[in-house]
Every structure is written in C-alpha cells, then in structure tokens.
From Swiss-Prot:
Gene Ontology process terms (BP): mRNA processing; regulation of gene expression; rRNA processing; tRNA processing
Entries under InterPro entries matching the protein: dsRBD_dom (IPR014720), RNase_III (IPR011907), RNase_III_dom (IPR000999), RNase_III_sf (IPR036389)
Protein name as annotated: Ribonuclease 3
Domain DRBM: start-end pairs: 162-231
Family: Belongs to the ribonuclease III family.
General function of this protein: Digests double-stranded RNA. Involved in the processing of primary rRNA transcript to yield the immediate precursors to the large and small rRNAs (23S and 16S). Processes some mRNAs, and tRNAs when they are encoded in the rRNA operon. Processes pre-crRNA and tracrRNA of type II CRISPR loci if present in the organism.
GO MF annotation terms: double-stranded RNA binding; metal ion binding; ribonuclease III activity; rRNA binding
Pfam families to which the protein is assigned, alphabetical: dsrm, Ribonucleas_3_3
Length: 239
C-alpha cells in the first residue's frame, strides 16, 4: 500500500500493463485505488466506484454463466454466481494483480487487517472494474472480467449444488440434526454491507462465512464446513 502518495507515472504504466487496459482518463485509475482513509479522499475515494463495479461484475459474470451452462437452472446459476462474485473470489483477483501494492491509504492503514483487508482488496477490484467501464465502456469491462473469471467459472467447483441444501441433508443423515445459522456481525455502508454468519451442527465445530449478503455468508459458512469435514473436496487456491 502507498500511504498518502498518489500513483507515479511509472506505477500507473506498470499497473495498466498488468490489468490489460490503458486509461484515457488516468484519474479514474487513481480514484479506483484510493481508500477512504487517504487524506482529502472524502470526495474522491473508491466507494462510489465500488458500488457501480459490483453491478457491472455481476452482469458480466451472470452473462458468462448463462452462455456457458446452457442446461443449468436458475438455482444452480445463482449458486455459481454467488461463489464467483464473492469477496474471497474478488480478493484473489486483486492478489493476482498485486493491487495491494498500489492502494492509496491514510494514517489508519494499520487498522486494516484480517477480514477487513480481504474486503478492501475485493472492493478495489470492483472499483477498478467500474473505472474501466466508465473509461472504456461495457465491452472493455467485460474483457477484463472474462480474462479473470472465465477459468473460475469453468472450474469443477462451480458445479456443486447449493451448500446449505447439501449441509442440511448431510447433517440430518450423520447427526439427526439440522444446521443452525447465526448472524454475528453486519458492517460496511448500506450500499455495500458485509455479513458474518456462523453455522453450527451438533457434534462438530462451527464454521463462519463473510459475504455481501446474509444468504451468501450462510452459503460460504456451509461450504467451509462441508470442505472441512471432507464431504466436499476443498477448492484449489486459484478458484
């Protein structure tokens, strides 16, 4: 992270090469990488871009899934979509692009740790998608999304059924009890909330999940429990 300072021309050029897009208006890229903690960032941080980028990403991935999985029903497509646009998935894209090296932050950067740091990385990816969309249009944004999500969408992990349904059936068969979900935390602005949910099954340790929706967090918690117990094969780091 770059505390307080803006992107240099060299930094900007290197990042544009990494993301595969050259900005006509360079300030769009700067804003996409400016955390709200940065000095004088009140009117120029990435939060508004993040709001738009979330929608552009969802549209592009939904279109990709619709065109790829012709026999999938709405429920399966929704499960795939939730997995692919989750904070964890977006944060992995940020890591692949080393975006953390370019985020402009303020003096309280040390407070950004753990899950919040994952959310920051995910938010920056969404704001970057919005910046590309505003600068070059939907097709430019779609090319970026397809470059980083096509392989993820095609992975075997995407074919899994609904994690909550799977956990419900497994828990009943193994323990004779239903899973219980508890919302532990809700954070973030109204337009981009983060929910942390714990799932408990009698007889085994609980698991937690964090996502932009309560249902998404429940799905992630259920998925983690299924993976931990060996019911599902754990996802590879690239998916």
């Amino acid at each position: 992270m770059m505390k307080g300072r803006s992107l240099s021309a060299e930094d900007r050029a290197r990042l544009e090469t990494a993301i595969g897009y050259q900005f006509a208006e360079k300030e769009r890229l700067d804003r996409a990488l400016t955390h709200s903690s940065a000095r004088n960032a009140r009117a120029s941080n990435y939060q508004r871009l993040e709001f738009l980028g979330d929608r552009v990403l969802g549209l592009c991935v939904a279109e990709l899934l619709f065109q790829t999985f012709l026999d999938a029903n709405e429920g399966e497509l929704s499960v795939r979509l939730n997995q692919l646009v989750s904070a964890e998935s977006c944060a992995r894209v940020a890591d692949e692009l080393s975006l953390h090296e370019y985020i402009r932050t303020g003096s309280d950067v040390k407070k950004i740790t753990g899950k919040h740091m994952m959310n920051v990385r995910a938010d920056v990816v969404e704001s970057l998608i919005a910046a590309i969309y505003l600068d070059g249009g939907l097709e430019a944004a779609r090319r970026f999304v397809l470059r980083h999500w096509t392989d993820r969408a095609a992975s075997a992990d995407g074919a899994r059924r609904d994690a909550k349904t799977e956990l419900q059936e497994w828990a009943h068969a193994k323990f004779g009890a239903a899973p219980r979900y508890r919302t532990d935390d809700r954070s973030g602005p109204d337009h981009d909330p983060r929910f942390t949910v714990t799932v408990e099954v009698d007889g085994i340790a609980p698991e937690t999940g964090t996502d932009r929706s309560k249902r998404g967090a429940e799905q992630i918690a259920a998925m983690r429990l299924l993976e931990r117990e060996g019911v599902w094969q754990k996802r590879s780091a690239g998916n």
